[in-house]
Amino acid sequence: MVIREAVASESRPAATEAKAMFSWIRPISRGWRICSAENLIVAAAFLLAATPATSPSHAQAPATPIRIDASRPAQEPDLAQYDEGSATAPNGDTLGLNSRYLMRNGKPWLPVMGEIHFSRVPRERWEEEILKMKAAGVDIVSTYVFWIHHEEVEGHFDWNGQRDLRAFAQLCARHGMMLQVRIGPWDHGEVRNGGLPDWVLKQGPTRVNDPIYLASVHIWYAQIAAQLKGLLWKDGGPVIGVQLENEYSKRGPGAGEAHILELKRIAVACGFDVPFYIVTGWDNASVPPRAVLPVYGGYPDAPWDSSITKLPPDEVYAFRSQSRVTAGAAEDSTRLAPDTKTPTAEQLPFLTAELGGGIEDTYHRRPVIAPDDIAATVPVMLGSGVNLYGTYMFQGGTNPDGALSTLQESQDTGYPNDLPIKSYDFQAPLGEFGEERAALRKLKVFQYFLNDFGAELAPMTVSVPEMQPRNPADFSVARASVRSSGNYGFIFCNNYVRGYVMPARPAAQFLIRLPHGELAVPRHPIDLPSGAYFIWPFNFNADGITLRYSTAQLFARVADSGINTLYFEAVRGIPVEFAFDATTVRTLKASSGETLRDSGTMIVSGFQPGVESSIDALSAQGNQVRIVVLTAHEAENAWKVRLGGSDHLLITDQDLVADRDAQPGQIWLRSRGAPRFAFTLTPPIASPLKANLPLALSSTTSGTSSFSAEAPSWSVPLEYHQIQTAGTAPPVKLGPAFDWRPNRVAQAPGPGDLPQAAEWEITVPEGSLTGLSELFLQIDYQGDVARLTANHRLLDDDFYNGKPWLVGIRRFLAPQGPSTFELSILPLREDAPVYFELGELAHFGSSGQIDKVDDIRLIPEYQLEITPGESLGRKTD
């Protein structure tokens, strides 16, 4: 019964279509579902009234304008219904908030937050991974502190090695990264018992105001506080907030808001005096008024779902105009809380902590996340009013070894899903071994936009189109919104849904009613391609020049020699057009396209994007402004860096590590597989560069400097051979049922099943790392579960999902001599009740099972180190 997805736009039976109508009721929490009767009644009534007979609709969209009324007068935000802790640092810097947005030093602030779990990453890699996150535009690092990782045995605390929270926080401080600490006591994070040690469960009731439980929590919180002493915001440190509990919606005596308040009281008593105390806000969460801030999220898939078929369209691709919890929901979870004093959405800013940067593979559901699956959610969430963009996970990891047990979530421990024992890759933008994925590059474009223009976006309010989708499965209506302040703002649009083909929208045009009249964007209707998503500015003040609109996405600002350069990204499939208020422009010259005047507007149409193409203008006040429109490929590969005291965009296909605030600047480029490097700097660099490899200046223009380098080619033989053939895989067992998921799901094989695995021995020669930053072992296989061991110690594991398994082995190589690994692959049974999104499995044959290795190879990762130096490089012809 192995289920394989074949075609994204397949036709589906009526029962499946009906399921699509109700798909958005599915909550976003990773593995838990708590739906109140009120939620279900409201949802059912809404859908019966609004849902079409067949859904999703794949019909060609009609040629209709997208009308949005954003004419209401801008209103000042109210005071937030929240009492923050100490919010002033010793240097006078302050953090705060009002009812609409966060503030830094009294000014609007829209930060980017990314999740990494320090205890799942080797200590020696922390600094590099923090720098990667920073280079990609992350402002705040978020991390769980898993109780079971630090006190697996009662009274024996481990804060050493990769469990050293204090050292991790100090690294964040060193690199100017703020830190949000999620202190539990229950965390989830796909960890055993949600992070609670086994001995805590044996004490009695948990997650309620039980005296024995709270006494243990007090000791736990005090331990964390001791680790972070002197590192809080008020001390000049990076810790700006703590999260209490997670996905908490218990009600009853000693539970609910009373429990959250007690946890906060204990945290404060232990020394946690921070600006922001947060709780997750979904699943009818407990949000005591004024004490905590709710944060929200959403994921591109639901591997905790019991279905082993393709899921309906996910709500995360539809704008949340009525709720912060889910698109189309009638009520926000905070409004459903029994305490009528609970703050409403209008009294607190829309903050997020768990917008999926990927998703885990569970044993029974193995989704494969594409880069657009992640990036397309960004304009949706920002266009829904989000004013803290928090990604879970931003960096994957590996579960540490436990002293008493393995540390992953499993059905054997009463939890709903089976996860790999070691791997927590999460298909994140930064993988388990630090590899930079395409999703990182796409996310980075939006994160740079928030870095440079978030302060302008934060105060803006949301306006929605006159016509909106009736539910997330309704594809017949364009998905869009506007955030604006007066006549100035941004258009947000998404025409992408994971796993489905959205219709192209011919003759699309945004007609925005503003306080001073209507604005048409663009001036003539265009065809909106299937799969497009973007953020476009309108009436944007470009250093004195009013940009009426652009059909390219603004994403970065770089100042160079008194000239502000604005960088835009061309949206694939949409012609680039700029319209300027002619009264604000003295002169304008475009390197391509046609420039014309129309009713007081200066229009550049047919502009050809590329790093060498620009629009150079002089404002009526005499300010020089340059606009550069990069192709989508160039923008996704552009990094903001600082070299020799000046800011640049560095465009490269290679991975990048850099501290963009460091002086004079140092950059590491990484190339996986090929020894060649190439990069372009814009604006061009005036100071010299040096590198660890011969660096050639391949070209220079008025707008760019381009360089290339090549490392000595690496070649090391890899030896592997099969040492055991597979036995007969046992029938797949089903795990327990749950109230919220009555259908039982497949359970991962246990230790008793391992003797049936096929085995291979892999030998990596001594010295294989010479000249490399990392060495990856790529295993192309088909099977059920794969494990990599050395001397019978499990190093990493994988649930097969149709993609090659990539393992960074630098951390596993022997210090001397060759390194030997054992690869075991448990056969996949043809009748396994498991969902595979990708991968055409080979013929199972008469055995009814498959365990197959197509190839095992080593992939070198080369490194180019760049710093300001003595020469610009060797000029090439």
Can you annotate each of these PLM segments?
Residues E38-P52:
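Bacterial N-terminal signal peptides
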Residues A61-I140, G869:
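N-terminal carbohydrate-binding accessory modules
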Residues K202, Y213-L228, D235-Q243, G256, ...:
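Carbohydrate-binding surfaces of carbohydrate-active enzymes
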Residues W126-R192, K264, V268:
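Aromatic-lined substrate-binding rim segments of carbohydrate-active enzymes
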